[in-house]
């Protein structure tokens, strides 16, 4: 059974077609880049997978289930905009995650915080933007999920923070799960990607292994993307 299957999925906002007859299969054990220009349909696809939107037509299956209560148990989602209460202490947020998610590994979260010399007694609002992003990623990656969906995990942080975030993703990745990373900073993440999905005008225009794309095109993923989308 595939981890994710999208069959003829279409999503409209009024008359605007955000996703157009999307067919997609994702297997376990992959780190996948979901790449496309602004307005291409990336966020819509992510919201559909997370049961935040419902398709107008077609079917989405995650481990054989339609998006809902059961799939939320196995998906760990990092949205582009935070949902955390910055007045909470870090240890309070960790307790919240522990209470809410059966697969949350408290010891992993504290170990990752320790490596950054972050005091769990600190309130989130006292942290820099980069540190807040790291804490949010730590919370997401401390779950033992089967599918991680990260929406712009390295957006708005400095290069050193990006390296830490990518390293955290890799070290907490296991072969029984897959990770979908949506980002516009392709050159920063392409080294960790097993596969890439290019989406344009609501359609999947390419889904290929990273190595195969580099071999066939003779270009980096970032270079190929810029040429195809004229960025």
Regions found by a protein language model. Give the residues of each.
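The feature captures the beta-strand-to-loop junction immediately N-terminal to the Walker
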Residues: 35-37
């Amino acid at each position: 059974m595939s981890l994710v299957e999208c069959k003829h999925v279409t999503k409209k906002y009024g008359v605007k077609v955000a996703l157009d007859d999307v067919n997609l299969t994702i297997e376990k054990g992959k780190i996948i880049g979901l790449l496309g220009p602004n307005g291409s349909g990336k966020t819509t696809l992510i919201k559909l997978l997370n049961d935040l939107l419902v398709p107008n037509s077609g079917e989405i299956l995650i481990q054989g289930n339609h998006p809902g209560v059961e799939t939320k148990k196995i998906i760990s989602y990092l949205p582009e905009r935070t949902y955390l209460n910055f007045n909470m202490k870090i240890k309070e947020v960790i307790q919240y995650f522990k209470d809410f998610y059966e697969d949350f590994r408290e010891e992993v979260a504290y170990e990752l915080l320790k490596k950054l010399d972050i005091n769990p007694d600190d309130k989130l609002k006292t942290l820099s933007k980069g540190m807040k992003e790291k804490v949010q990623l730590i919370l997401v990656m401390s779950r033992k999920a089967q599918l991680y969906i990260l929406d712009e995990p390295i957006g708005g942080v400095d290069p050193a923070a990006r390296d830490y975030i990518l390293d955290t993703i890799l070290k907490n990745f296991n072969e029984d799960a897959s990770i979908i990373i949506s980002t516009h900073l392709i050159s920063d993440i392409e080294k960790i990607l097993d596969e890439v999905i290019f989406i344009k005008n609501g359609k999947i225009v390419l889904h290929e292994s990273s190595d195969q794309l580099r071999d066939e095109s003779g270009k980096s993923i970032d270079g190929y993307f810029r040429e195809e989308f004229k960025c």
